[in-house]
Swiss-Prot record:
To C.jejuni CJ0253. It holds the Pfam family DUF493. This is Uncharacterized protein HP_0495. Coiled coil: none annotated. It comes from the Bacteria.
Amino acid sequence: MPSDSKKPTIIYPCLWDYRVIMTTKDTSTLKELLETYQRPFKLEFKNTSKNAKFYSFNVSMEVSNESERNEIFQKISQLDKVVQTL
């Protein structure tokens, strides 16, 4: 098996970035979700699509382990106005 197919080694806790694409500029539900983790986070507006149909944001926050990182990803992805989470 080639070495490039291995999972990268991530040392936790670490700062993790999520790119969130939404159909609204209103990030209140996203902020509410992130606040439930009771730790600092950074939420930055990044881009608007050409026709202003989508808005992208960058979320940075510390995650304790892979399970928590994946849980946050899933919860963000399930928000009503979220189209995609990367």
